[in-house]
Amino acid sequence: MTIFDNYEVWFVIGSQHLYGPETLRQVTQHAEHVVNALNTEAKLPCKLVLKPLGTTPDEITAICRDANYDDRCAGLVVWLHTFSPAKMWINGLTMLNKPLLQFHTQFNAALPWDSIDMDFMNLNQTAHGGREFGFIGARMRQQHAVVTGHWQDKQAHERIGSWMRQAVSKQDTRHLKVCRFGDNMREVAVTDGDKVAAQIKFGFSVNTWAVGDLVQVVNSISDGDVNALVDEYESCYTMTPATQIHGEKRQNVLEAARIELGMKRFLEQGGFHAFTTTFEDLHGLKQLPGLAVQRLMQQGYGFAGEGDWKTAALLRIMKVMSTGLQGGTSFMEDYTYHFEKGNDLVLGSHMLEVCPSIAVEEKPILDVQHLGIGGKDDPARLIFNTQTGPAIVASLIDLGDRYRLLVNCIDTVKTPHSLPKLPVANALWKAQPDLPTASEAWILAGGAHHTVFSHALNLNDMCQFAEMHDIEITVIDNDTRLPAFKDALRWNEVYYGFRR
């Protein structure tokens, strides 16, 4: 069972009574056939539920109103099978607060050249019925997605499925609670921001809990539960000699397990699905949570270090979007560079907290090593390299008057040399279009040093996310040129200034 099983998407057919009962009967028959086929053949993440035909303003308004109040409804897919006068949709669309996709399709793929008549033409009017619907969306300034293609086309299936992921993610975000254990890393700017504005824009709430509250729960974990979790570690990971039974760091592993169990219990009791820590707020904890955070991220929790609640929320959102897709998604940080002409590289990592979902190794190494930051006992952590191939890094920043999402398309590569003295998980990548352009564009746009790294999602996913939440997106990829990029930043400043 996945999060998508908790939601459904309503399939709504627009028509009118002008064409008579026989035409409406055929429209209903076609709709039932299409919905059944999509549910069985299209590999959609969510179930489509066919709703009664929308043929009058009152019927359409009722469907939109019901969608708003049904927690299982993640959004609406609308198909204008015949011509459906768009003034009928105004009241419904005015109140609709769920994502909307217009499926611009028709029942038949090919025209029946020898038999086509006006009955056929009146029944299959998507070509201009869809344009009427599109006009009212533009006139109302209502953001909605459009997918064109025959309902049996695999590309159309993929695009609808991708939109469904966004729709479910948006509904999940409205219920998302972010827990901050302690505050921001002191004097850091980009991890701060307006939490009230974030809740208004995205729906997620952000609140702080004292580390002492967490420590109480951690200390309540039984030794039996700790030992059972360590047994799981033994089966899932390659334990270094120091972490094995009778090893000099075995106690640190036991303490890491206790912290993991305590954190998970705290998060579950509070209904949190994202959280932050900071090495400056560890009073009562024996070590900085490393292994615990890595494993919780792998279970779907959002996380970011140093109190960075925006990145923690974004990671949770992207985890939901990517559920069931190949590849992982993790908290990340651009840490250091390798400058080599024609082969500039970025080494991404963090002090400890990189999600094993992006690991190339089947059994990562579990080790305990010294960490100079935080002033606590040596923390346990998983060490691994990252899968290779196309990926993205994304950052959500607060500009005061709006949110900006930055996305850099990257290509992860194999580490050319072993890293015997680097005791943390890491990812190595080439930034698109090149490191100088990518880094300069990122800096000019104000991108954070914390990001969400994903093999599972792509640029199109993040563009859909930005559109659905009505926020600015800044893209850095192989098409990026700095002069045009700077111009776009200036134009966006004017555009969003007019929208205040």
From Swiss-Prot:
<dbReference type="InterPro" id="IPR009015">
    <property type="entry name" value="Fucose_isomerase_N/cen_sf"/>
</dbReference>
<dbReference type="Pfam" id="PF24856">
    <property type="entry name" value="AraA_central"/>
</dbReference>
<dbReference type="InterPro" id="IPR024664">
    <property type="entry name" value="Ara_Isoase_C"/>
</dbReference>
<dbReference type="InterPro" id="IPR055389">
    <property type="entry name" value="AraA_N"/>
</dbReference>
<protein>
    <recommendedName>
        <fullName>L-arabinose isomerase</fullName>
        <ecNumber>5.3.1.4</ecNumber>
    </recommendedName>
</protein>
<keyword id="KW-0054">Arabinose catabolism</keyword>
<dbReference type="InterPro" id="IPR055390">
    <property type="entry name" value="AraA_central"/>
</dbReference>
<comment type="similarity">
    <text>Belongs to the arabinose isomerase family.</text>
</comment>
<feature type="binding site">
    <location>
        <position position="333"/>
    </location>
    <ligand>
        <name>Mn(2+)</name>
    </ligand>
</feature>
<dbReference type="InterPro" id="IPR004216">
    <property type="entry name" value="Fuc/Ara_isomerase_C"/>
</dbReference>
<feature type="binding site">
    <location>
        <position position="450"/>
    </location>
    <ligand>
        <name>Mn(2+)</name>
    </ligand>
</feature>
<keyword id="KW-0413">Isomerase</keyword>
<dbReference type="GO" id="GO:0030145">
    <property type="term" value="F:manganese ion binding"/>
</dbReference>
<keyword id="KW-0479">Metal-binding</keyword>
<comment type="subunit">
    <text>Homohexamer.</text>
</comment>
<feature type="binding site">
    <location>
        <position position="306"/>
    </location>
    <ligand>
        <name>Mn(2+)</name>
    </ligand>
</feature>
<feature type="binding site">
    <location>
        <position position="350"/>
    </location>
    <ligand>
        <name>Mn(2+)</name>
    </ligand>
</feature>
<keyword id="KW-0464">Manganese</keyword>
<keyword id="KW-0119">Carbohydrate metabolism</keyword>
<dbReference type="GO" id="GO:0019569">
    <property type="term" value="P:L-arabinose catabolic process to xylulose 5-phosphate"/>
</dbReference>
<comment type="function">
    <text>Catalyzes the conversion of L-arabinose to L-ribulose.</text>
</comment>
<comment type="pathway">
    <text>Carbohydrate degradation; L-arabinose degradation via L-ribulose; D-xylulose 5-phosphate from L-arabinose (bacterial route): step 1/3.</text>
</comment>
<dbReference type="Pfam" id="PF02610">
    <property type="entry name" value="AraA_N"/>
</dbReference>
<dbReference type="GO" id="GO:0005829">
    <property type="term" value="C:cytosol"/>
</dbReference>
<dbReference type="InterPro" id="IPR003762">
    <property type="entry name" value="Lara_isomerase"/>
</dbReference>
<dbReference type="GO" id="GO:0008733">
    <property type="term" value="F:L-arabinose isomerase activity"/>
</dbReference>
<dbReference type="InterPro" id="IPR038583">
    <property type="entry name" value="AraA_N_sf"/>
</dbReference>
<dbReference type="Pfam" id="PF11762">
    <property type="entry name" value="Arabinose_Iso_C"/>
</dbReference>
